[in-house]
């Protein structure tokens, strides 16, 4: 894959999808449907998915594509593929909380290597450059031109005073029980892939996820964190979280800055 070609395409499509999502977000009302797995879906999910998938297929016709909203893409069997969640954090979108993102990533041999996470309501854009370094771009954003970027690097954690970020919509007792194993200075809650990005920027040290996620929920954020020097491991045995799994369901996981002394499950 030519990363110098890929990254600008992913960034542009994320911006275009974000603009479409915000049109619907700022409308007086929008319909919410329920999918077969009981998760919500809106016109914004579908419009963003159509835009991104068409753009990726046009630019990279020979690359396998997996996208949340198209079930016929879920049987690819490939270990190298593009993966999309056109609107991650649909519940945040529905409740107009702003913590939703557009996620686009490249997975190579089971590892997310390049990704973009764009939070249009927050005006925050994170992506991995062609060289693999993660940056945050300052707005306002232009489709064809990348603005000022700041390279990101996870911070060195203080295990006696950790900053923890957890899910805004999916927090439960199991998550709290695990967090309580650490010496926590402060807690933050965030929706969607923004949790990975907060670890990447140094705003948090660790993000444990003790709950259901799919690969399209995590691949872009995983790539962003990886490009900032962070890591994502399985909750049960702390082995690397891999992609291309049958059904695309993730095990529980921990995203963290190296130096955090991980506790057993």
Question: In which residue ranges do the predicted regions lie?
Answer:
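Oxyanion/phosphate-interacting regions
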Residues: 1-12, 18, 177-181, 196-265
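Acidic beta-strand-loop-alpha-helix segment within the catalytic core
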Residues: 105-196, 244-265
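Thr-Gly-centered strand-to-loop micro-motif
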Residues: 67, 166, 209-210
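N-terminal subdomain of lithium-sensitive/metallo-dependent phosphomonoesterases centered on the IMPase/IPPase/PAP
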Residues: 1-87, 173, 177-181, 197, ...
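General small-molecule cofactor/ligand-binding pocket signal
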Residues: 66, 185-189, 233
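Glycine-rich active-site/cofactor-binding loop and its immediate structural neighborhood
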Residues: 78-117
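Short clusters of hydrophobic/aromatic residues that line enzyme substrate/ligand-binding pockets
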Residues: 30-32, 41, 65, 134, ...
């Amino acid at each position: 894959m030519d990363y110098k070609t890929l990254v600008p395409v992913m960034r542009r499509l994320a911006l275009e999808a974000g603009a479409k999502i915000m049109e619907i977000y700022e409308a007086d009302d929008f319909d919410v449907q329920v999918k077969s797995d009981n998760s919500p879906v809106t016109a914004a999910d579908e419009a963003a998915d159509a835009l991104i998938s068409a753009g990726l297929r046009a630019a990279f016709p020979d690359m396998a594509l997996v996208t949340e909203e198209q079930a016929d893409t879920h049987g690819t069997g490939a270990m190298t593929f593009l993966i999309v969640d056109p609107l991650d954090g649909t519940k945040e979108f529905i409740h107009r909380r702003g913590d939703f993102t557009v996620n686009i990533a490249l997975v190579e041999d089971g590892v997310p290597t390049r990704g973009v996470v764009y939070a249009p309501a927050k005006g925050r854009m994170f992506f991995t450059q062609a060289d693999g370094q993660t940056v945050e771009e300052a707005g306002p954003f232009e489709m064809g031109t990348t603005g000022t970027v700041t390279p990101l690097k996870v911070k060195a954690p203080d295990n006696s005073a950790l900053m923890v970020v957890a899910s805004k919509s999916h927090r439960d007792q199991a998550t709290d029980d695990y967090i309580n194993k650490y010496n926590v200075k402060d807690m933050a809650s965030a929706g969607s892939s923004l949790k990975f990005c907060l670890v990447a920027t140094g705003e948090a040290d660790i993000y444990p996820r003790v709950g259901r996620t799919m690969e399209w929920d995590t691949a872009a954020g995983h790539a962003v964190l990886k490009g900032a020097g962070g890591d994502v491991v399985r909750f049960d045995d702390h082995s690397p979280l891999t992609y291309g799994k049958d059904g695309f369901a993730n095990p529980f996981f921990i995203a963290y800055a190296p130096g955090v002394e991980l506790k057993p499950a």
